[in-house]
Amino acid sequence: MADLGAEDKLKQICDALRIETLKPAEDEADAIVRNAKEQAKRIIDEAQEEASRIITSATEEADHKLKQGESALAQAGKRSLESLKQAVENKVFKESLAEWLENTLADPEVSAKLVAALIQAIEDKGISGDLTAYIGKHVATRAVNEFLGKTVLAKLKGKGVAIGKFVGGVQLRVEDKNWVLDLSSDTLLDLLMRYLQKDFREMIFQGS
């Protein structure tokens, strides 16, 4: 059975490293949000104009209906607006953030820095074992190995990084403990969306 104390340490390492990736991403996200705001505002304005026309027409008809029917229309309108917000988030914000993240993680030097940071983090926690580092499938292993250098490569099983099944980012596997420290692109995108989604909504959908 795995040592629960060590597993807690592993979780702390992953959390700390993921949070460190947020700072440059927040700066880029600000630019994405600014660029997206004009596009999102246009989409929302058009949708709200159409919604206003529909609501006006529906209101005239609703005057002849029971309050229960009017309430149902209001609820439907709220659900439609929420669906619109989610569509804008996915189209304007998430896709832009994913594209930026993919481009950033395609840099072999970035992958090398992430691998080195993960190795240093587990060493600082006193965790040892056979290590296998995986990088994104579109990143050149040779370039990453050159950035890592002989000292770090000597700590890896096979004396070099391996290609993972993910697009970008890295994973570090502690073989004898069957642990995987995950900083892959999908994991980082989910993390960034959770941290930045609220700020995006507040900026884009103010007053809506």
UniProtKB/Swiss-Prot annotation:
Pfam families cross-referenced by the UniProt entry: HrpE (PF06188)
Keyword Ion transport: yes
Superkingdom, taxonomy of origin: Bacteria
GO cellular component: proton-transporting two-sector ATPase complex, catalytic domain
SUPFAM superfamilies: F1F0 ATP synthase subunit B, membrane domain
GO BP, one annotated term: proton motive force-driven plasma membrane ATP synthesis
InterPro entries: ATP_synth_B-like_membr_sf, ATPase_V1_Esu, T3SS_HrpE/ATPase_suE
Single GO term (MF): proton-transporting ATP synthase activity, rotational mechanism
Keyword Secreted: no
Keywords: ATP synthesis, Hydrogen ion transport, Ion transport, Transport
Family: Belongs to the V-ATPase E subunit family.
Function in brief: Produces ATP from ADP in the presence of a proton gradient across the membrane.
Protein's UniProt name: V-type ATP synthase subunit E
